[in-house]
Amino acid sequence: GVSCLCDSDGPSVRGNTLSGILWFYPSGCPSGWHNCKAHGPTIGWCCKQ
């Protein structure tokens, strides 16, 4: 997936590690991940937690 900013990464993408991924499946995030930001019915911002 494509990296994305999780809430735990900080307020901005500059200088922060992007620990999330954009996940393009309506079935939810991979095992061990959770959807930290809803982004439409088929895209989720998934974070490890």
Curated annotation (Swiss-Prot):
Residue runs in coiled coils: none
Question: Which residues pair up as cystines?
Answer: C4-C46, C6-C36, C29-C47
Keywords from UniProt, A to Z, are: Cardiotoxin, Disulfide bond, Ion channel impairing toxin, Nematocyst, Neurotoxin, Secreted, Toxin, Voltage-gated sodium channel impairing toxin
- Secreted among the record's keywords? yes
Gene Ontology terms: cellular component: extracellular region; nematocyst
Superkingdom assignment: Eukaryota
Gene Ontology biological process terms, A to Z:
regulation of signal transduction
The protein's location, in the record's own words, is: Secreted; Nematocyst
InterPro entries linked: Anenome_toxin, Myo_ane_neurotoxin_sf
Q: Does the keyword RNA-binding apply?
A: no
Q: What does this protein do?
A: Binds specifically to voltage-gated sodium channels (Nav) (site 3), thereby delaying their inactivation during signal transduction. Thus it may strongly stimulate mammalian cardiac muscle contraction.
Sequence similarity? Belongs to the sea anemone sodium channel inhibitory toxin family. Type I subfamily.
What molecular function terms (GO) are annotated for this protein?
A: sodium channel regulator activity; toxin activity
Protein's name according to its UniProt entry = Delta-actitoxin-Axm1h
